[in-house]
Amino acid sequence: MIRHFTSTVFVVFKNKIALHWHEKVRMWLPPGGHVDLNEDPIQTALRECKEEMGIDISIFSEHKYKFEDTNLQNINPPQTILIEKVEDNKIGPHEHIDFIYFGYPKDPNFKLLSNWIWVDSKDLMNEVKFKNPELKYFAPPNDVKVLGMDALVKLKNLSN
């Protein structure tokens, strides 16, 4: 089975998460993408937010280790790691090993690209359907609902 490493970030601001309509997989998703050669998963998360959303973010982590050894650098762990089954017409069936992070904008006066929507906890809990570019309505998938709710709880006081 072919496997790719990916990173996804649930970006929280003012008690909402940012989602966009992903044309390829046809779902409302947070920013994310494949880990590039010589990139660690956090670098991927930061890059994808800049490329897809046009903003710089900070990664939230509950784990902070400090080492005095200059040969060691700590990379904070993700909130979770998902194995996601993917169907692709070019590659065929494969899996994504997806590092899931929570983050928030570095600059509270950021300008978000127009293809993004802000979704709050009520929207997630009630499985509200949002209009995509084809004027059809879809709710975010269950994993986005569950992880989005967790991100909103954990970052409640950091993103206002």
Locate each region found by the language model:
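Conserved N-terminal beta-strand and adjoining loop/helix that marks the start
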Residues: 1-17, 34-37
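Histidine-centered active-site/metal-ligand motif
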Residues: 4, 22, 34, 94-96
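Generic hydrophobic secondary-structure packing signal
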Residues: 5, 41, 144-147
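Residues within alpha-helical segments
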Residues: 10, 46, 50, 149-152
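Residue-level signal for short segments within beta-strands and strand-turn junctions
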Residues: 11-13, 21, 104-105
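Conserved Nudix-box catalytic region and its N-terminal flanking loop in Nudix hydrolases
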Residues: 16-67
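Nudix hydrolase/Nudix homology domain
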Residues: 26-28, 92-160
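Active-site segment of metal-dependent pyrophosphate-handling enzymes
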Residues: 54-107
